[in-house]
Amino acid sequence: MQRAKKIAKPILQIGLPLVILAIIIFYIRRDWNQLSTYTFEWNPALLALAFGGFLLQELTYGLIWRSVLARLGSKLDLRISLRIYLASEFVRYIPGNVWHVLTRVLWVSKYGVSRPIAFASMMVELITKLAAGVFVFAVSLLFWGDLGSVRSLLYGTPIVIALGVLTIVALLVVLHPRILSAFLNTALRLLKRKPVVLTLHYSDILVVTLAWCVSWIIAGFAFYVLLLALWPYTPLIALPICIGIYAIAWDIGFVSFITPSGLGFREGAVIGLFALALPLPGALAGIIAILSRLVSTLAELLCVSIAYLSGGGQARAVQQEQQAEQGLKQEDTEQQDAVLLATDASERQSIEEGVVGD
């Protein structure tokens, strides 16, 4: 069973994105004639502006994490916090999906931040980031006005608006420190880490969530500009809709937990939501989904590479230290198993000698 799981996991991680990509390419080819009826062009200036927007969002990640650390009682220099955050993201492309977490925790501990606080800051960062994505999408539903496909699906625009309002209220409840602390310590227990006392006030959590909302607005604006670069007649009303779609698509990709960075799932969500929200041909939605992944990934790699190189060998040293710790833990486990086996053998021998003596 375990061997089957080990084989199935990489197959899913590699095969599923390829299947989704193949489906997207199929629809792009199928709808290409329909796409040719639109005014379709490449605007280099707008593409560069979109790239700059995704770069700016990458920088907000480190700034928000630094703010969370400060509110938990640990302050870092601005340049150091950006370098740690971005450089630790470099190892996210290593199989395992946990190396960037461990690297950041070990690296920040060099500057006096305890590991429980570091883990807590990352959990708060992640929860508020996901919540902000849902919040931004819920607000964007208020702009889903004259959309026949949504009406036919949900029996009227008022229901869409009500859904957005209820989602916002639910998020405000979940982000309360008592509830958030319960989620946080549950996650830490699952990671076999010590629980922490969340010292954040409700206002602190709301401020951090608001900062993430600003980050999503920046990325969503870049996403809208990307669409504008290909389809110059994109209406302005599409701006808040694009912001909401990009934010919730990132959330969907993240919580899929199957493929790295939600590869395939995020693109599928973008295409599906565009089909509901905007009168775009399927081919154009597919191109935007793939292009947004490409441009945002290039922006991320640029920021991460600069931070990683500017950090010198420190990030690599932290990785080696973490691998050494994992090796020591494995050796300790093997030694404990050997002691237990030796003890069991000794006990069995004593019992057998006693039986023979009797």
Residue ranges and their predicted role:
Residues 1-86, 143-254, 277-358:
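Predominantly cytoplasmic-facing regulatory/coupling regions of multi-pass membrane proteins
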Residues 61, 99, 132-143, 164:
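Membrane-embedded alpha-helical core segments of multi-pass
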Residues 70-72, 79, 100, 106-116, ...:
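Transmembrane-helix boundary and interhelical linker motifs in polytopic inner-membrane proteins
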Residues 82-110:
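Extended non-transmembrane interhelical loops and adjacent amphipathic helices
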Residues 87-94, 247-267:
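Transmembrane alpha-helix interface/packing and boundary motifs in multi-pass membrane proteins
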Residues 90-95, 109, 119-138, 252, ...:
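Membrane-embedded alpha-helical segments of transport systems
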Residues 106-117, 267-284:
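Interfacial segments of multi-pass membrane proteins
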